[in-house]
């Protein structure tokens, strides 16, 4: 009976069986983890033009770092003559999606109820999404690709299963640590069946991957805890193709100093801590404007907080498509995030030549060298943030020095050429071995 199970995936069923105290055994498939011979991964290799599939479980295009990463990588690879296809669930027919969803839901409910006596709504809904996405990916001829690049753990699981037949180099880039972040914010509970389920998917994504490309070194430790080998992980910091707008000089005293925050208005971005910090230093903000760029679920709450704290200098601009222009007029960029990987907005601010204040979440300390290219704080510490703001408001020389250093760092390390070149050489190494 066990051997007949193909969906849910046998390894998921085995993990859930273990959680519920059932005995089961599924034959283990040996997945090759052979790596290219040791050499500098960023030296020039083959000039072959590759055919590459970049795939994500999430909607694309969309606002945010993941969508930008995919667009940037695809654009850079195409500029070098490579063929790139991008696949995401929202590209498929809504009628077909509905049909698949309706067909699998009762089967999943029946399977989980018969086997475990009940089912988790979260797991049921997720398995339904996985099933639909897998059915869509089944229609694609993977044989025509030289390289497969999954942008999340779910796509890595699906492509990994298919790749048992095709044996293509499969790269995996996590854009966040899925289970860890959901535990941190109480979206799922510690020691729950949901934790067991998602951790198994994360571990299997690592097992299926020929190589893991991470956005920052902050991913290494949690990935290694899930079973990754350090030698199978390469850090490639995100680069962007940033429009070079000349900075707006503010020579006269009548010009206000501009502080800008570009971020989705959500609970993880820490706008409330920025507002608290501003309330501590009101006497230093008489000739200052604070621009809040972005929109989201927290807007009404933040507008009430602004009013309650008497922060007349704060202006909500909503979503904007002229962020580079806004940043070119910005003196201090602030991102008080309490949970992040490698924020695109910081990279944009550094390219614009703006002094940056942010927190030590994720890979941010790999972008901001404290007191050199900006200031790094503890997340959620409004007093530290107030002190940093006051320092840069009062100290023009420090602002200018950090701005210059940030721009120089971005021009050297955070470009599309740097990012794409490193990833392309990894692709080439694995393609040549394959």
Task: Describe the role of every protein-language-model region.
Residues 178, 192-211:
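Membrane-proximal helix-turn-helix segments that form the acceptor-binding/catalytic region
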Residues 319, 338:
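Aromatic "clamp/platform" in nucleotide-sugar-dependent glycosyltransferases that forms part
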Residues 370-371, 375-382, 391-397:
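Conserved acidic donor-binding segment of nucleotide-sugar-dependent glycosyltransferases
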Residues 150-155, 174:
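Short His-centered aromatic/hydrophobic patch
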Residues 218, 239:
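Carbohydrate-associated surface elements
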Residues 384, 391, 398-412, 419-425:
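A short, well-ordered alpha-helix in the C-terminal region of glycosyltransferases
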Residues 252-269, 275-278:
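Conserved donor-binding/catalytic core segment of Leloir-type glycosyltransferases
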Residues 355-358:
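Short hydrophobic beta-strand element within catalytic cores of glycosyltransferases
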